[in-house]
Amino acid sequence: MVKNPSFYSVIIGTEILNGRRKDKHFEFLNKELLKRGWEQKASFVIKDDPSFMEDVFNLVKKDENSVMFSFGGIGATPDDYTREVAAKVFSNGIIEQNKKALELIINQFGKEAYPHRVNMANLPKNSILLKNVVNNVPGFGVDERFFFVPGFPEMAQHMVIEALNRFYPKNIKKYSCNFIVHSSENDIIEIMKSLPLDMEFSSLPKFIGDKRIVEIYIADFDKNRVKKWCEFFKSEVDRKGIKKDVLSDDF
């Protein structure tokens, strides 16, 4: 388990990129993370290309705080590359037949588990299993950080919830303020520059008719720090004589 995790999603699906299917994983994962006080650092939608999958997995692995959910490619067909690539990147290329996974597959399919379905029990070394509520063929995780689930949402979603509940149930509370400034971003850039670089900050410009407004969001885990810089920003806006509307003060 990672103490200060950065969450990533890798959605493997040529059929999403060519328009044959719509992605349902990003929105679901985001919702489950936000419910627990987490958020994603990055999300990738990529083709079923083992070389490129390896590059993306290695990129995620370089972040020492990374926690990844990979969707798709863990079935039994020739274009399911995820188990092999995951083993190469996350367990030194070692794949072993997971006895519990094999038992689940045989119990589910009987004689029809052979010769192909049993290959879904060949997992990266020391994998943990994630329950499949649809057909009992498990997803898996490595190092309590890198989780691999099917591309089918009805299977994947329960596994995501299981992994989060087991290993990343809840973050410490994040404090924030959110308000509208009735000006362009250009008018308040100097105020923005005054904020500490390590503070979470975003500005979202919008148009209401022909008028420009900016939605400001400031957040941090330190309550007093958030209060200080939210009040600073608002007071500087007031000093410039610019109207503002407070949406929320959570500190």
Spell out what each predicted region is:
Residues 27-89:
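N-terminal small/polar loop signature for handling phosphorylated ligands or for N-terminal nucleophile
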Residues 4, 64-65, 211-213:
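A general structural motif
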Residues 144-236:
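An accessory alpha-helical subdomain
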Residues 12-14, 70-78, 219-221:
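Glycine-rich beta-strand-to-loop/alpha-helix junction loops that act as flexible
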Residues 2-43, 47-48, 227-228:
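Glycine-rich phosphate/diphosphate-binding loop of Rossmann-like nucleotide-binding domains
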Residues 51-55, 62, 81-170:
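Proline/glycine-rich low-complexity loops and linkers
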Residues 236-251:
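Conserved short beta-strand edge segments in small beta-sheet-based binding/regulatory domains
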